[in-house]
Amino acid sequence: MPSPLAPMAVFVDLDERSYTVHFDSLATVPSLLEDVGLAAGRCLLVTDENVARHYKTPLIEGLSNAGWTVRSLVLPPGEQTKSASCLHRIYDDALAWGIDRQTPVLALGGGVVGDLAGFAAATLLRGLPLVQLPTSLLAQVDASVGGKTAINHDTGKNLIGAFYQPELVCADPQTLDTLPMREYTSGMAEVIKHALIRAPDLFEALEDHLVPVMARKDREIVSSVIEDAVGVKADVVSADEREEGRRAILNFGHTFAHALERVAGYGAFTHGEAVAIGMRAGLYLSHQRHPEAVPRERLDHVIRAVPIESDPAEVPFPDLYAAMAADKKNEGGTIRFVLLEQLGQAYVTGDVTEADARHAWQFACSN
């Protein structure tokens, strides 16, 4: 939904917790903080080593020039950082520095940093102002929007977390220029997901421009599909903030994906790669139930545009299924899947047998 506040922005309508996703330079962050009523003072900047090399220094300089005193914490990159130990590093550093409830937490990085720093903000002093500064495509179109924050547990992914909305999101399109191609194409998996579950027009745009979009060669088209994808996420979240109903459709592909990430070991697949594989499995199940309404070959062609570097077939299905049984979305011991009724319409079901899931996994792993 277009924001009433800016031409290149998306508004997330959550009553008193509403905020805007700005598609603008990180140089605008000091003024954006002022716009939402965050007066210059102390702020805690959380980022990772990869992102820090490119964006930490200029961001701190801009904040300092605007009167902010910045404490920065640079963490290792990768999914392993979404852990209790790294969370406590943030706690220890923040409390030793002497934060108060007016100290904003700035999450500069991809989905891992956003989830981790967001959960720290949600729990430190029972809540600090949170500002999401996503630098990866996956974070810009998905992880930074909607208020989900979490860390992983040995039992599964994102099992310890909270819903906690940011004060604002600033997604700088230029940060995608320094993103490794694998991370970029992985992020496109979430764009494709948003198109499949809610936006046939976005899916058609991806179909029509699949090669330049996946190759990151047309900035105008890429910017357009990103903004449309964020609009899908914002609309769904605005209608169901805490995933009590409709928001669950955003988990299309994620039941398989989260299990795959856990069983294969975090880092073997990027989150986007796992989601792409999970969407192929979900597409198989959807077509099985709605063969006329869900054109499997057409939709699969776009999903397959996401390159997969590791072989999911090496993950034994019994291990995968056991991991799915521990998924946080399950209810009453039933594994819940998001399926497509048709392009642009999705629903949640627990009516998937183990045999059906096995066949879907075999399809997802096929060439």
Curated annotation (Swiss-Prot):
* InterPro entries assigned: Dehydroquinate_synthase (IPR050071), DHQ_synth_AroB (IPR016037), DHQ_synth_fam (IPR030963), DHQS/DOIS_N (IPR030960), DHQS_C (IPR056179)
- Report the superkingdom from the record: Bacteria
Its annotated pathway reads: Metabolic intermediate biosynthesis; chorismate biosynthesis; chorismate from D-erythrose 4-phosphate and phosphoenolpyruvate: step 2/7
Entry keywords, A to Z: Amino-acid biosynthesis, Aromatic amino acid biosynthesis, Cobalt, Cytoplasm, Lyase, Metal-binding, NAD, Nucleotide-binding, Zinc
Q: Where is this protein localized, as stated in its record? A: Cytoplasm
**Residues the entry annotates as binding Zn(2+):** 190, 254, 271
**Recorded catalytic activity of this chain's protein:** 7-phospho-2-dehydro-3-deoxy-D-arabino-heptonate = 3-dehydroquinate + phosphate
Q: How is the cofactor bound?
A: Binds 1 divalent metal cation per subunit. Can use either Co(2+) or Zn(2+).
Is the Glycoprotein keyword given for this protein? no
Listed under GO cellular component are: cytoplasm
Quick one: a GO biological-process term for this protein? amino acid biosynthetic process
Q: Does the keyword Ubl conjugation apply?
A: no
Q: What is its EC number?
A: 4.2.3.4
Summarizing the function annotation, the protein's role is: Catalyzes the conversion of 3-deoxy-D-arabino-heptulosonate 7-phosphate (DAHP) to dehydroquinate (DHQ).
Protein family per UniProt: Belongs to the sugar phosphate cyclases superfamily. Dehydroquinate synthase family.
Q: What protein is this chain from?
A: 3-dehydroquinate synthase
In which organism is this protein found?
Answer: Salinibacter ruber (strain DSM 13855 / M31)
Read off the lineage from the record.
Answer: Bacteria, Pseudomonadati, Rhodothermota, Rhodothermia, Rhodothermales
